[in-house]
Amino acid sequence: MKKQAGFTLVELVVVIAVLGILAATALPRFVNVQSNARVAAGNGLAASLRSAANLARASWIAAGSQAAQVQVQMDGQAVTVNAAGWPTGDAPGITAALQQLDGQFVGGYNNGTATYTVGGFAACTVVYTAADGRVVTNLSPANCGGN
């Protein structure tokens, strides 16, 4: 007669218990992956805003640095700039300079600033100020949906 091979009930219970413990310790780590991804996306947006603002200002300087608010051309896209040469904090300004804005960023404009929320979290923001071309971020896993 052939002896049957397989796992005993005790061995199966031990393996399930070990897998449960591993899952309980690993799950919180995976929960923060989404908020960390939002922080990374926000940092990418901040870098894009800085680059777009600097490129628009460089175009303004190359065009003669006129003091009045004018438009500069960036890859065929008209970008409105202020008297200091920075893109204005609205759709014809900084948003036009970006040329593409992913749907995960929602922009709002108020008094020369453009505020973009990341991933739908109100505290997870990137703010562009048109007066001096400054970009300030409020990005942390806690602000962007994490614990």
Regions found by a protein language model. Name each.
Residues 19-20, 39-40, 50, 76, ...:
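Alpha-helical interaction segments
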Residues 37-63:
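Membrane-proximal N-terminal amphipathic helix
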Residues 25, 30-33, 42-49, 128:
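Generic recognition of well-ordered secondary-structure surfaces with a strong bias
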Residues 58-147:
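Periplasmic/extracellular, small/polar-rich flexible segments of pilin-like filament-forming proteins
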Residues 1-34:
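N-terminal single-pass transmembrane signal-anchor helix
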Residues 6-16, 53-65:
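Phosphate-binding glycine-rich loops and adjacent basic patches that engage nucleotide phosphates
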Residues 6-9, 16, 42, 95-98, ...:
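Generic N-terminal initiation segments characterized by hydrophobic and/or small/turn-forming residues
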